[in-house]
């Protein structure tokens, strides 16, 4: 049987006060209202302090474990986004785009080197795991309300608001595992 499942992440405050205040957490009730009206059977939320990197990854894993072939999956992220220097040498522009969990810091320091940023390669792996579980008969829609989530609705170079500074990494600081180069989660995606 086809089940509708969702993960809703909303972050409006951060552990690090250097981040600007945003209202990602305020989006959650509106999204939940729509999902409930659409009769989603499983809805996982991850809000503010719950939305640490470990909390977000755990929520994705819980969702993935419950998914079955042909399910409909909706994933919503409202929060900060930031670019960091590419750590996997797989980005033409040399920048990774990141979701910013509650416990991620805006700038590198002696004690923080970006390990709490949720890098696009990691997000892609989490989404690929879900796609593999729901199969070709399933449907997945991902909505990202964050800076640096893409330029589909805005012109290149058009600054609206948000974080312009790039999180600078030193290659010896971080080691993330990632999927094979040139693998694209969207290559097998079906129309919603």
Protein language model regions, located:
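Conserved beta-strand elements of the Class I
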Residues: 5-7
């Amino acid at each position: 049987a086809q089940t509708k499942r969702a993960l809703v992440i909303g972050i409006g405050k951060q552990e690090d006060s250097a981040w600007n205040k945003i209202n990602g957490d305020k989006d959650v009730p509106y999204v939940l209202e729509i999902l409930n009206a659409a009769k989603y059977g499983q809805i996982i939320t991850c809000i503010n302090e719950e939305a640490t990197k470990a909390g977000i990854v755990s929520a994705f894993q819980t969702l993935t474990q419950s998914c079955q072939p042909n399910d409909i999956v909706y994933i919503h992220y409202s929060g900060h986004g930031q670019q960091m220097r590419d750590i996997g040498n797989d980005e033409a522009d040399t920048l990774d785009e990141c979701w910013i969990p509650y416990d991620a810091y805006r700038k590198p320091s002696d004690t923080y080197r970006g390990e709490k940023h949720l890098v696009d390669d990691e997000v892609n792996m989490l989404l690929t795991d879900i796609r593999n579980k729901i199969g070709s008969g399933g449907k997945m829609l991902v909505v990202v309300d964050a800076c640096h989530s893409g330029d589909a609705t805005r012109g290149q170079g058009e600054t609206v608001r948000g974080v312009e500074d790039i999180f600078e990494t030193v290659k010896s600081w971080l080691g993330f595992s990632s999927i094979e180069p040139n693998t694209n989660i969207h290559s097998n995606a079906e129309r919603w």
